[in-house]
Amino acid sequence: MDQPAGGTGKLRASAGEDDSMELSTCQELLHRLRELEAENSALAQANENQRETYERCLDEVANHVVQALLNQKDLREECIKLKKRVFDLERQNQVLSALLQQKLQLTANSLPQIPLTPLQPPSERPTSPAPNVSEGPATSLPSGLCAGQREVCWEQQLRPGGPGPPATPPPALDALSPFLRKKAQILEVLRALEETDPLLLCSPATPWRPTGQGPGSPEPINGEPCGPPQPEPSPWAPYLLLGPGSLGALLHWERVLGGPGEEEGIRQPWASSRAPPSAQGPSSGPHCAPGSSSSSSSDEAGDPNEAPSPDTLLGALARKQLNLGQLLGDTETYLQAFLAGATGPLSGDQPGPGKPNSPDPGPPQVSKSKGLPKSAWGASTPEATRLGFGATSEGQGPLPFLSMFMGAGDAPLGSRPGHPHSSSQVKSKLQIGPPSPGDAQGPLLPSPARGLKFLKLPPASEKVPSPGGPQLSPQLPRSSRIPCRNSGSDGSPSPLLARRGLGGGELSPEGAQGLPGSPLPCSAMPDSAQLRPSQSTVSTALSPGPVVSPCFENILDLSRSTFRGSPPEPPPSPLQVPTYPQLTLEVPQTPEVLRSPGAPSPGLPESCPYSGPQEKSMDRAGSESPHASRRTPGGSSKKPGQGSGRRPGDPSHTPLRDRLAALGKLKTGPEGPLGPEKNGVPARSSAEKARALVRSGECAGDVPPSARPLEQPEAKGIFRGAVALGTSSLKQQEPGLTDPGARVYSSHSMGARVDLEPISPRSCLTKVELAKSRLAGALCPQMPRTPAKVPTSAPSLGKPKSPHSSPTKLPSKSPTKVVPRPVVPLGTKEPPKPDKVKGPPWADCGSTVGQPTSPVAGPADPSQGSEGPAPHSAIEEKVMKGIEENVLRLQGQERTPGSEAKHRNTSSIASWFGLKKSKLPALNRRTEATKNKDGAGGGSPLRKEVKTEARKLEAESLNISKLMAKAEDLRRALEEEKAYLSRARPRPGGPATVPSPGLGQAQGQLAGMYQGADTFMQQLLNRVDGKELPPKSWREPKPEYGDFQPVSTDPKSPWPACGPRNGLVGPLQGCGKPGKPSSEPGRREEMPSEDSLAEPVSTTHFTACGSLTRTLDSGIGTFPPPDHSSSGTPSKNLPKTKSLRLDPPPGAPPARPPGLTKVPRRAHTLEREVPGIEELLVSGRHPSMPAFPGLLTAPPGHRSHQTCPDDPCEDPGPPPPVQLAKNWTFPNTRTAGSSSDPFLCPPRQLEGLPRTPMALPVDRKQSVDPSRTSTPQGPAFGGSRTPSTSDMGEEGRVASGGAPGLETSESLSDSLYDSLSSCGSQG
């Protein structure tokens, strides 16, 4: 308008001269006015349109959030309803069991005449076992007969006219009550059904036979007093398993075995459970002895005998002529148990899951039907006591069943090796861990479907015995079990025992055991789990330690012998055993492993039988179960304990996951217990697990490792073991890329999990989540996902190598492993590096672990990567998919600018609401990653499409970037406020903390995380305040890193640079340094000297966590990322970044490790680039980042370097890194572009698949974002954290190439999400 004004003046001046001139001028001015008005209106319209678009995006995000919250609420309500229902049912069971008890007592009083007669007839009845019967049974039968007698009563009721002697009892039974008769009939029907149950039939009696052989263990439990008879009781273990749960089956078995003694033995075990102290010793000793041989034979012939078992049982019962009074008493107890469903399901389920199910299909069913009642019974006062909630002493009684279950399934393992004591101790440990849980465990072993159904109830009943609180907790897990069953469902369907162990067993054992643990510790379920593990550990560590070690080792050995033939690893096994015991579930899984290996029956007679079905189940599980077993072998090679631990981790995986997912409170409560287990990692992980039910698998994996560290006082050893495992896994992967590779990968996941958990709660969490996802997928991903993932695992072997996208995706998973592998992997990695040229991008995300594991780990990773997303509940997945689609739609509509659209798609929008803090966005990314992984090349095509779209919508993208810039300003204001609020803490923690993380990697990292976060905030505040010294300092260190990076590149030490990423986890970081030294010792040393790599990484990592938390606080603050795009350069960069992000979807799992890195970026960017990685990337691209002009300034030179990834010229830029060391934690993050670059190995890694995090200064700068994000998580954290680093990273990404950058961005988003989740979980 000035012109018009000026023009007007001119017009007036000219008016005097020439009116025509004036007119022309006026016309010109008017024309200009019109043009300006049109332009103004156009701008206003465009502004309005952009505002509308932005609002639409916000609305969409809000809708997604609301939808997710509503879904969460609905699920929570559903869980609550289910919990209430379970509680009500349990109460009903208790009431009914009480009534039944009263009735039985009345009937028993009325029919007390047959008290001892039946005992003697039983002796008579079993011709061969008669002596045995009379020996121990006579003594124990009075109390022990309850089980057998009950069965007899039922049998008699079922067939009142059965044998002549029973004729009297039948009348007595009839006299007992029509209720009993009905019960007997129901049991009969159930037995018949069970007999026809394919699952039960499938499970060979033989496996239980070994259990029977291991029954020595049952006896130790039943008559722990009877140390010598233990071998004898061992046979009874199956019977007890059957007997308590399905006395009918036991009876058939006994009769088949000729087991009056056996029957009695069963009864005795029952008696033991009923009157564990008195009946236990005598009954278990004598009857067990006969039962021992009988049991084996009966187990062998169990199936054939099963058909006649009802009649035979009735006949045997009739022969035995059990005392009617005893029968009534036993029946009462048995019915009580049946009603309670605690003992019944335990024993019944146990037999079912055990191979006795097949020999005793009917009885297991009966036991199952009883199981619930028994559980209720357990809930009922008498049975509850019996169940061994009160059952330490009782534990022997009910635990006999449980022990028998566990002994048959768990202790028999030890027993099989010929360690009756061990088996008994295993039981003991089982008892200790879950006296009640033992029962739950019993069901765990049982058929998955029934086991789950009954298990759910029995755990509930178990809960019932335990305080209401514990009951609820278990119930929640049960509820979650339903979803978990989907994931654990795998377990239930795929392998009878394997899945039973996982699906049913794990869930139930976790729940039941947890509950028993609850009863024992009377604490929350998590506590019970912890207690249980330690108890188990103690038990196993004690006498069973060695024996169990053989047991579990055998299991492990089976799996290992299959792969590694690690029979010599039994000593480590004890650790494993503790792990398994720690996860009572693991014990069932141990049988799984035993069965799964099948071939390896070294000292595992049962193992072989198990192996048959288990192997099938393993096959069923597909790669998952095998992965689980193989995982164990992989880990076991170097660290049998570790491998075993991993395996347990997997098993524990499900229960923990169930607990976490099912028990929202477990997030809080279990987290507390788990936190201790995991150095606080579990807490976060548990919360996150809870967040993603599917992730429950991951969570379980996470927790188990944590439990393991707790259990095994070799936490450090575990870390080392984890590293060793990682190494071992890597090695294994190298040798056996395909099966072992997958296995190794699984192992590695476990190892990574183990390492990560101990190392850095947050980084661990993210990585653990990945590991959890993998484990969940490998072990028991949630149904389809698991299969899909399993295939992913197989294809992933190739996938990681072939597509960068896939590798990128893999890195996510790999990163999880990366932490564990870094030390050994460094060496291994270097060799794999060459193999993994493609791995580099993948390695970018998980460069540290990526390369070594790349071939195998990659495939495994993909499966887990997909699993990671897959582990989310179907609803979650749907939500994620929906959000993803919406985001894509919005991007297509609003941000069609191709790359930007894509970048924002994955990165910006995701970062807006999801990437940054939203669980949903992260889920979206994960979904994308899953999709990309699912379609090996899918990721690339998507990216390409998005890119094309982005180009079209580039203009729009710029506008959106401007809008986003505004949003970022707002966010910055919020973040500044937050930063100021947290400034006090951060500043103190600042630089001093950095060395701490690098040095005290595990603890230092924790400390560093917090201090680092503070420092990060402080630095952010400084940045905001206009203090650019830190950026300069960061820049200074950068050159060093750059120098370091170039060296790295040559030897591929970048992977060692990845070590820094592992460095995220302090220990790994340290390892990473050592690894690097080999190729670039000097450089590495430089890095350490500066603390730049390890220290910054660890500190950054912590900072990232802290920042993440703050970022989470900022929440939508993620939107600002587009802000950076607002500048023309940023938008261009954004598209690339977007591509990177899109790539990252495949590398979404890698994103997790980057997540930590990303978190740092976000954390560092909080103020300037809180907008998100995109913003960071953009900012890196354009030094016009308002928040960090200094950083931006530094980035320009570095940018040029980044642009030239091969330019070691960055070394000039790196000189500032000297200071970087000071501010490494946060400064790196801030100086992302300039000083972080040293950590930015990613550019090079991205570009030069070598993925040498430190390849070149330039590379590093470029890589910093991607690599930092992915490969050198530690450094990535440090570097990525810095907004400058992010900016530089973006530039580096652009320079490196869209794909790597994209991958990195996505990885960052994903990893950011993970970090945020971890931070959120932790608080």
Swiss-Prot record:
Comp. bias (Pro residues): 162-172, 226-236, 353-364, 1143-1153
Pfam (any one): NCKAP5
Example GO BP: microtubule bundle formation
Region named Mediates interaction with beta-tubulin and is required for microtubule bundle formation: 743-1136
Bias (Basic and acidic residues): 647-660, 925-934, 1027-1041
Short motif (S/T)X(I/L)P motif 2, span: 808-811
Start-end of Low complexity biased regions: 271-298, 799-817, 1302-1323
Annotated localization: Cytoplasm, Cytoskeleton, Microtubule organizing center, Centrosome
Region (Disordered): 1-22, 113-142, 156-175, 204-238, 260-314, 341-714, 778-875, 892-948, 979-1003, 1027-1323
Record PTM Phosphoserine, positions in chain: 436, 447, 466, 473, 489, 492, 494, 573, 760, 1184
Region ranges (Mediates interaction with CDK5RAP2 and is required for homodimerization and microtubule bundle formation): 1-135
Domain of life the protein comes from: Eukaryota
Entry keywords, A to Z: Coiled coil, Cytoplasm, Cytoskeleton, Microtubule, Phosphoprotein
The protein's role, per its UniProt record: Regulates microtubule organization and stabilization. Promotes microtubule growth and bundling formation and stabilizes microtubules by increasing intense acetylation of microtubules. Both tubulin-binding and homodimer formation are required for NCKAP5L-mediated microtubule bundle formation.
Quaternary assembly: Homodimer. Interacts with CDK5RAP2. Interacts with MAPRE1. Interacts with beta-tubulin.
Protein name: Nck-associated protein 5-like
Organism field: Mus musculus
